[in-house]
Amino acid sequence: MASGILVNVKEEVTCPICLELLTQPLSLDCGHSFCQACLTANHKTSMPDEGERSCPVCRISYQHKNIRPNRHVANIVEKLREVKLSPEEGQKVDHCARHGEKLLLFCREDRKVICWLCERSQEHRGHHTFLTEEVAQEYQMKLQAALQMLRQKQQEAEELEADIREEKASWKTQIQYDKTNILADFEQLRHILDWVESNELQNLEKEKKDVLKRLMKSEIEMVQQTQSVRELISDLEHRLQGSVMELLQGVDGIIKRMKNVTLKKPETFPKNKRRVFRAADLKVMLEVLRELRDVRRYWVDVTVAPNNISYAVISEDMRQVSSPEPQIICEAQGTISQTFVNFNYCTGILGSQSITSGKHYWEVDVSKKSAWILGVCAGLQPDAMYNIEQNENYQPKCGYWVIGLEERVKCNAFQDGSFHTPSAPFIVPLSVNICPDRVGVFLDYEACTVSFFNITDHGFLIYKFSRCSFSQPVFPYLNPRKCTVPMTLCSPSS
């Protein structure tokens, strides 16, 4: 019955907002009482300005000046906090669940409170046992030190949690700032830069989602980590405030839990290492895009012409060209001579379009290839055999106006050889900001020029051959070299 009365009293002095015993209780005109902190927080969220407010329970209006501290309720709460367990409940805690005897001893090896019968049992035989009063102070000091350590860890956990939230907010602000700048930069060139803007915004949005997702995960981990430490602290505080039995019962488990407490550092993302958008010179980009837009007006649908000389593998739609495996070449020749396998075989092939006048433009997809050569070739068919690695035939005087890639990163143009080495082409290393995955080729027959554009890098010019001598029809030229990944002629609609 006494327990029921205590429950009723506790309900009367419980805050309706936080559902805990009232702390610094304040009463309103309607008679309801709330914690001072809860009522203040409710004011800020419900009505931040001064004036009339309403009770969170009954909604009766009240004036802020009429709020008064309720010392009577505060005294009741204080008394309620001092109430101990009933004698019957205490007796249950003080007695061994197995033997019914009083728990007066503490086993050092098992870290358990035991009775005198437990001490004599096989389970505790030979163990060091002491009176509970003798070891209580020792464990009091241990748990007190552990509590201090956990409070420090709690502070560190809360600081880490605050840091990750601050970083999250900073990332959102920075991403929004970058997004605004991108939109402003491209506003002047909207009619020709829509595709560039879309690409940059997609990358930025992807970065935002990826980083914020990982930061959100870190934040959740930090919250869970902080909550775990709080719960352990609460358990320790309860033990330290309770009786000796409450302090020592299950102390082994609590100590193991404390030893397992480790704070995980959140994953962070230094802003100086992030991908930052760099707007190119808008005037230069405008000129580049205007030039690319102009030459794309002459886009022709190019396909390749099969022949019996080239060993290139051609797709059914006549758009993809790839290099076969060396073994296939040997089998085609009826021999598996190692000499022939090591010999560099011709995989160059012409486009089916014969060009004798006008302006012509096409694009070639070379993504994922480690080596390729492309451009234009004069004549009806490239030579069947030559040393590809030395590129002996790749010179304008031999009818080739081409550029190429080797070793995935080295981009070169091939000009006529010097006076001292006329048979070998002069290699012109090309500087490109981004290795091209897609190359545009523009041939102006009357102007005698062949230009190459890096479509991957907004269409910037890679190289231009001038004063070309077109004494006969010229054809688009592709050579996948030894890389078996195909190169693809793109359709005008792609």
Curated annotation (Swiss-Prot):
Its EC number is 2.3.2.27. PANTHER family: E3 UBIQUITIN-PROTEIN LIGASE TRIM. The lineage of its organism: Eukaryota, Metazoa, Chordata, Craniata, Vertebrata. Residues 282-494 form the B30.2/SPRY domain. Keywords: Acetylation, Antiviral defense, Autophagy, Coiled coil, Cytoplasm, Immunity, Innate immunity, Metal-binding, Nucleus, Phosphoprotein, Transferase, Ubl conjugation, Ubl conjugation pathway, Zinc, Zinc-finger. Gene3D superfamilies: 2.60.120.920, Classic Zinc Finger, Zinc/RING finger domain, C3HC4 (zinc finger). Degraded in a proteasome-independent fashion in the absence of viral infection but in a proteasome-dependent fashion following exposure to restriction sensitive virus. Can form homodimers and homotrimers. In addition to lower-order dimerization, also exhibits a higher-order multimerization and both low- and high-order multimerizations are essential for its restriction activity. Interacts with BTBD1 and BTBD2. Interacts with PSMC4, PSMC5, PSMD7 and HSPA8/HSC70. Interacts (via B30.2/SPRY domain) with HSPA1A/B. Interacts with PSMC2, MAP3K7/TAK1, TAB2 and TAB3. Interacts with SQSTM1. Interacts with TRIM6 and TRIM34. Interacts with ULK1 (phosphorylated form), GABARAP, GABARAPL1, GABARAPL2, MAP1LC3A, MAP1LC3C and BECN1. A zinc finger (B box-type) spans 91-133. This is Tripartite motif-containing protein 5.
